[in-house]
Amino acid sequence: MGRCFGIGPFLCPPAQNIRKKITATQNILLYLQSKSKHMAMLAKFAVKNFRGFAEKIELDLTRHSNFNFNLYAIKDDVIKNGIVYGPNGSGKTNFSLAVFDIVNHLSQKWKKADYYANFTYAGDPNLKVEFEYTFRFDGQTVEYSYAKDYHGIMTAEAMTVDGKPVFKRADGKFTIDTEAFPIDKSIQHNLADNANNIPIVNFLLMSIPLAKDHYLIRLQQFVNGMLWFRNLDVREFIGLETSVYMLEEYIIKNKLIDDFRRFLLNVSGQEFEFAQPRAGEKVLFCVIDKKRIPFMAIISTGTKALELLYFWMQRMGQATFVFIDEFDAFYHFKLAFEVCKILFNKDCQVFTSSHNTYLMTNDLLRPDCNFILNENKIKPLVDCTEKELRFGHNIEKMFRGNAFKV
């Protein structure tokens, strides 16, 4: 294996080898790797009345096509990797935040402090925000839906597994599969009223002994592994971790300085000589003309973004679903391509949003993995045209020529 976080060398070439087509052999290797084990997957997501989305908007990751290239982007018949495009103000950030609402009540991981500010659709803040998730856990299909008011308080909740109802709470009523969860009538009555707004999933997880492969345990594990982050005016993240790290202190403490140096060289072509840290030092220093200069004092905004990405890539071994908002805001367009090749080979679902149409190429993904979000809809490119799309098509040129209509 290569030295780029366990990723084969053909996925982490020098930066000048941009858009080098993945050979048939490499594609087969990636496909076999993707088939090596089942993953817990987010298969569908829908939301209504969230911020700017007055109508229901749905992302269906089971609607993939039968392209015979870049097979690694599909796992267990679910889209594993994708990029979301859309005009400014179309709702890319808000949609990604909506996907991560589930972290707020099913996980003790890091939360976005202002998440529930401007939570509901501005046209009618009294409307309930409705969320629908479909997960795939080793052949099981778990559908989980709920509604929250403008304070973020849950007002309804329901779950089905393989089409069979598990529980439902709505309008002061509560039903549950008592064979699967034998709980007293008095408790069922209290859950119907639920004055203290305890999510039913959390109650069952805390009250009922479950097997380690039970779908509720799998759901909890999946949500604990969800990660959203961005690096714009401020660095923000949701999920996966319970505390904030100092990036360079983390690199030093975990003896990753040389690995970080190779990462910067491989993805961006930048070569730094890092000084050996002295006892107690928590920041990186570079050696320039035999002088120690603080790393942060000499690097660009884009390289700072790469440092943040490097940190999260170290943590992605624990991740299940990752969304990086405006991931390439400070990247050169070719650097963004190299970063995507690394991200999309991770053993978890990874999605990004971007305005960089250089990434809209069949050398990286497929037309069913590039999405356009606009006017309260999100669709893959294959559903935005009647034309049959093939590997040889220049989909970036087609996009710029307005060939795709949402």
Question: What is each PLM-predicted segment?
Answer:
Residues 27-38, 44-48, 56-60, 107-312, ...:
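Phosphate-coordinating catalytic segments in nucleotide- and nucleic-acid-processing enzymes
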Residues 329-333:
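Conserved D-loop-proximal element of ABC-family nucleotide-binding domains
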Residues 325-326:
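Walker B catalytic acidic pair
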Residues 101-113, 317, 345-347:
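Post-Walker A helix-loop "phosphate-sensing" segment adjacent to the P-loop in P-loop NTPases
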Residues 22, 28, 32-44, 337-406:
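C-terminal lobe/lid and adjacent interdomain/linker elements of RecA-like ASCE P-loop ATPase modules
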Residues 2-3, 7-8:
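Targeting/processing segments of secretory and organellar proteins
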Residues 320-321:
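The start of beta-strands in P-loop NTPase/AAA+ ATPase cores
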Residues 39-100:
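Pre-Walker A-like glycine/lysine-rich segment at the N-terminus of P-loop NTPase domains
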